[in-house]
Amino acid sequence: MAVPETRPNHTIYINNLNEKIKKDELKKSLYAIFSQFGQILDILVSRSLKMRGQAFVIFKEVSSATNALRSMQGFPFYDKPMRIQYAKTDSDIIAKMKGTFVERDRKREKRKPKSQETPASKKAVQGGAAAPVVGAVQGPVPGMPPMTQTPRIMHHMPGQPPYMPPPGMIPPPGLAPGQIPPGAMPPQQLMPGQMPPAQPLSENPPNHILFLTNLPEETNELMLSMLFNQFPGFKEVRLVPGRHDIAFVEFDNEVQAGAARDALQGFKITQNNAMKISFAKK
């Protein structure tokens, strides 16, 4: 049975999520599987009884939300198929970008008797384009950038260039593969007589098994599988008992493993952990 869709929106609403998954882990896993569709501004998850098993993912572009909805509809996520549709109203962060945001005093509205509510106030609360999602909670997540109400690029640290998806990943809407987004650092230009930066030492020969290092403590098998199963030939992820920082990923052949390695090299699962990928020793 198809999930009914409302009009396209920057925000997608996801339900039928596994309620046993911790909030922090759920946010990181959602980011891992949806970041391939475009820039994510925020992910809203609440553990309240009313909002369990639900989440909202806010994209900068509507086209990103559309691609995510169509591609991930029914995707088995923690053993349950996701049900996805567009959110009915704009989130606050999108309303601010559009210039339609209206600040609301929720406490005052809550205290005001119904008899004193004017038609205009009812319309602002019920139909305002900037109405937030009821029950949505925004809070810092260990290992992820703080979720703010102002649009910004994920993983942007002071003194560093904005985060860019790794080569081979789907580029942000409106940009061709390899094109530099506005504000990103261009490739380094060498001056006459200047030596290029030292290249890393040669690594192990090609192998159909990849060796992953510098993984954060909260990394799990499902999270890595969602990152690598978008590449042809993916077979499985193997974690090492007693070691959270390393893992192995197996592909059908060396060429497919190399393509995944090149695409996800340096991918930041968390703000401070850029994944390092090499061919496993034979």
UniProtKB/Swiss-Prot annotation:
InterPro entries: Nucleotide-bd_a/b_plait_sf, RBD_domain_sf, RRM_dom, U1A_RRM1, U1A_RRM2. This is U1 small nuclear ribonucleoprotein A. Keywords: Acetylation, Methylation, mRNA processing, mRNA splicing, Nucleus, Repeat, Ribonucleoprotein, RNA-binding, Spliceosome. Residues 100-130 are annotated as: Disordered. CDD domains: RRM1_U1A, RRM2_U1A. The modification Omega-N-methylarginine is found at residue 152. It is found in: Nucleus. Disulfide bonds: none annotated. It comes from Sus scrofa. The modification N6-acetyllysine is found at residue 60. One of its GO terms (biological process) is mRNA splicing, via spliceosome.
